[in-house]
């Protein structure tokens, strides 16, 4: 709830979250989290064109273009967009691999996405080449990234915003001069415009008031 809210505040697509109590034949089954499905309706809220390919990364990096799950257009599967990205990474200039990807990846979106992953300590996301989604925006003809499976956030408050990256794109971002400069500028912008501690604490308190009675009931 808190983490996805921060992504949305920053303009990065992320599911909406709700809570519900479930009962079957009047037998209570407790409190559950409702996570918005990343469906065509979700894409319509964020994009003017929704016919692009939507991929899910699960312990696979973007260069493994045959292995990523395709969550849309399954009846007419075509991975040319992802294959082009993978080939561009293979051919990237060793001296400047980050900027050479600008024709295939929305660099602003990706930088914002990775910076937010570090801020909320989404250690199990693209940082580990896991739990991420990427959408090929037909309007810009570039890939955009957004979070997925963000259920282990804020676990290490001492986390380093320059932590090691397994993802080939995030390594190119953080470990090259031009990418690192862009990353630091984005981190500064997010800390000034999105990371509002009073607002975050207020959301936490609001959520606590909402679900605490039901958690107590579940534990009884």
What do the PLM-derived regions correspond to, one by one?
Residues 1-220:
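Phosphate/dinucleotide-binding and metal-coordinating scaffold of catalytic cores
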């Amino acid at each position: 709830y808190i983490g996805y809210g921060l992504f949305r505040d920053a303009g990065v697509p992320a599911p909406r979250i709700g809570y519900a109590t479930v009962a079957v034949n009047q037998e209570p089954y407790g409190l559950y989290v409702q996570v918005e499905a990343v469906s065509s309706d979700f894409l319509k809220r964020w994009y003017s064109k929704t016919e692009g390919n939507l991929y899910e990364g699960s312990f696979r990096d973007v260069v493994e273009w045959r292995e990523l799950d395709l969550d849309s257009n399954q009846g007419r599967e075509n991975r040319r967009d992802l294959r082009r990205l993978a080939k561009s990474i293979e051919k990237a200039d060793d001296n400047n691999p980050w900027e050479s990807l600008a024709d295939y990846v929305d660099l602003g979106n990706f930088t914002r996405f990775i910076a937010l992953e570090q801020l909320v300590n989404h250690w199990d996301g693209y940082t580990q080449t896991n739990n991420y989604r990427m959408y090929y925006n037909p309007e810009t003809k570039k890939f955009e990234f957004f979070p997925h499976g963000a259920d282990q956030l804020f676990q290490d408050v001492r986390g380093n915003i320059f932590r090691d990256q397994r993802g080939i794109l995030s390594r190119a971002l953080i470990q090259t001069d031009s990418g690192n400069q862009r990353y630091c500028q984005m981190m500064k912008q997010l800390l000034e415009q999105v990371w509002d501690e009073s607002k975050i604490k207020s959301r936490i308190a609001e959520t606590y008031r909402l679900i605490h009675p039901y958690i107590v009931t579940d534990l009884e």
